[in-house]
């Protein structure tokens, strides 16, 4: 993008700009035009909006034509920008392609102090098929009367969920970073979002809250849809709504119970109602946590979940297939996918990139084999940058680390999609651990902007030239911190050098990884010097960093002077 903006036709001062859209412009094309208009207005241009007539009739006026084209040389979500004289055409392979083509123009305006430095000829499209971030409707404590993962959507538990202005800011951030999916994590969301004719008592919130939820989720999915964003609802299995379970004398979750016709019917109808009611939604299915056997996983996925999705589509008269994601956690993904792919094609698998941490851009070992096995199943594989306890609570944002990590997702794991957790404070969304001078808490989107921008940029294209990227990030950081690109280079170096610290510390000194790891949460001396006294994950050491030694192994070699070191610890020791 940064390099593309160097190819331009310079505009002479502030002027009138016309934005033309066809008479049948889709909601995504109209959204693109509005976003472009807002940017040009802020840059001081007089903007004329023209829908219907797309004839370039006045060569004296700078004109931008937005259109969807049936150009099979472009990938999905791809675009083609051409500039000849005063006419710039943005042609999208689809509505999302127009959105991203307009984002290219918007970035060119913002990165050139408001000049209309548009590309003369540029084609681009994303590498990764799904590129998205998640927000959790979950908490670290149980609600009264509920079990783990059971959090109905209510203003008391999640007041931020009902803040439309905050959602618009979040969705616009996703668009600006070329992301096309929003993942919402919750144990059993359906009883907060849909009513079932056969099970009216299953609703888990009061009528007033249900109306709020209905209105908010409709708002969220509609706003996401016009931005080309799928809202993908995650849920655990098998979890029942509390009033449904109580009505039939059941537990809300019981890992040892078999699938019954009643439980299957309730879940299938819940999924169907969800698909029918809300636009541009998908599902992220976790078969782990509350299922009995792998055989049950296959039956549940193919005879309950997929039929529920198809029922919802049939009610709408739709023939497309929304994305259906299968999380590899605690299930046999291959067995499930082998049974599911013949009956549903738009399937994805998902697995954690470095487990529940961020430790390396050189993954290897048995955990990497899980990824390669999944990516060979015949569907798109998603790399999940999962909860990142080793980065807590500090800000982190190394462009170099992220670019290399995304390259590893492609080259080592075979992944072609991204699921991204917040950089820190997942359980405390939307706030960070920081306080502002006025005593208010800082928002994650304000503090951790570089987290989303780096992952979004490299999910779109991880093959960018490193020299160009240094220039790009120097400029971005210079704009953000109000300094020159040259001075901002020092900030970038600080981000990149400090970005190696937490990953290296955990992969060499931690006893495990993720939301259970103790390195930064209060590690005992005995855990540091003799991890074998505790539960360690051998796969972590074998997979989430370069080959090396634990501290106890390093010291033993030093004591015996019998073997050469094979560890990053040697360089740390020499320092």
Residue ranges, per PLM feature:
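Surface-exposed patches in mature extracellular/periplasmic domains of secreted proteins
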Residues: 45-52, 114-121, 185, 287, ...
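A structural preference for short, hydrophobic beta-strand core positions in alpha/beta folds
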Residues: 49-51, 233, 326
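Catalytic-core regions of glycoside hydrolase
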Residues: 160, 180, 204, 211-219, ...
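Acidic, contiguous N-terminal accessory segments
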Residues: 3, 11-85, 115-119
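Structured segments of extracytoplasmic/periplasmic soluble domains
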Residues: 35-46, 104-112, 173, 177, ...
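Feature activates predominantly on carbohydrate-active enzymes
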Residues: 16, 32-35, 39, 72-78, ...
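Alpha-helical packing segments of well-folded alpha/beta enzyme cores
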Residues: 36, 166-170, 174, 216, ...
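C-terminal non-catalytic alpha-helical accessory regions
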Residues: 147, 422, 426, 433-436, ...
């Amino acid at each position: 993008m940064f390099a593309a903006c160097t190819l331009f036709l310079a505009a002479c001062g502030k002027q009138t700009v016309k934005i033309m859209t066809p008479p049948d412009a889709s909601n995504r094309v109209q959204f693109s035009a509005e976003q472009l208009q807002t940017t040009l207005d802020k840059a001081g241009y007089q903007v004329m909006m023209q829908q219907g007539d797309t004839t370039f009739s006045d060569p004296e006026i700078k004109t931008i034509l937005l259109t969807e084209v049936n150009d099979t040389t472009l990938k999905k979500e791809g675009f083609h920008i051409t500039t000849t004289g005063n006419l710039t055409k943005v042609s999208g392979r689809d509505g999302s392609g127009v959105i991203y083509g307009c984002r290219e123009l918007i970035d060119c305006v913002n990165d050139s102090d408001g000049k209309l430095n548009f590309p003369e000829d540029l084609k681009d499209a994303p590498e990764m098929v799904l590129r998205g971030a998640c927000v959790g409707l979950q908490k670290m404590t149980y609600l009264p009367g509920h079990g783990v993962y059971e959090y109905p959507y209510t203003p008391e538990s999640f007041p931020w969920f009902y803040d439309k202005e905050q959602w618009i800011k979040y969705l616009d951030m996703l668009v600006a970073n070329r992301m096309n999916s929003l993942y919402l994590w919750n144990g059993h969301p359906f009883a907060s979002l849909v009513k079932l004719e056969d099970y009216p008592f299953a609703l888990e919130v009061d009528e007033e809250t249900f109306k709020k939820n209905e209105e908010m989720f409709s708002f969220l999915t509609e706003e996401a849809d016009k931005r080309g964003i799928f809202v993908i609802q995650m849920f655990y299995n098998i979890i029942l709504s509390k009033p449904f379970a109580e009505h039939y004398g059941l537990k809300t979750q019981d890992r040892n119970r078999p699938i019954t016709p009643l439980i299957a019917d309730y879940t299938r109808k819940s999924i169907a109602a969800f698909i029918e009611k809300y636009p541009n939604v998908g599902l992220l299915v976790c078969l782990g946590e509350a299922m009995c056997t792998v055989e049950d996983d296959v039956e549940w996925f193919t005879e309950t979940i997929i039929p529920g999705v198809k029922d919802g589509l049939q009610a709408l008269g739709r023939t497309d297939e929304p994305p259906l994601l299968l999380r590899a956690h605690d299930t046999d993904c291959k067995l499930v996918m082998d049974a599911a792919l013949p009956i549903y094609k738009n399937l994805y698998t998902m697995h954690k990139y470095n487990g529940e941490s961020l430790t390396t851009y050189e993954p290897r070992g048995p955990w990497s084999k899980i990824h390669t096995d999944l990516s060979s199943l015949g569907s798109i594989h998603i790399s999940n940058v999962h909860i990142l306890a080793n980065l807590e609570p500090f800000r982190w944002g190394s462009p170099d680390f992220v670019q290399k990590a995304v390259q590893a997702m492609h080259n080592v794991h075979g992944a072609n999609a991204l699921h991204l957790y917040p950089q820190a404070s997942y359980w405390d969304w939307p706030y960070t651990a920081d306080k502002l001078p006025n005593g208010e808490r800082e928002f994650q989107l304000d503090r951790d902007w570089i987290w989303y921008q780096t992952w979004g940029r490299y999910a779109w294209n991880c093959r960018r030239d490193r020299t160009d990227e240094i220039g790009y990030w120097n400029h971005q950081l210079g704009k953000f911190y109000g300094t020159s690109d040259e001075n901002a280079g020092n900030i970038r170096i600080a981000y990149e050098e400090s970005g190696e610290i937490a990953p290296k510390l955990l992969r060499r000194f931690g006893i495990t990884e993720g939301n259970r790891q103790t390195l930064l949460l209060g590690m005992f001396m005995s855990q540091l010097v003799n991890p074998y006294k505790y539960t360690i994950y051998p796969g972590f050491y074998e997979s989430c960093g370069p080959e090396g030694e634990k501290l106890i192994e390093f010291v033993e070699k030093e004591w015996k002077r019998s073997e050469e070191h094979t560890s990053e610890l040697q360089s740390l020791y020499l320092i």
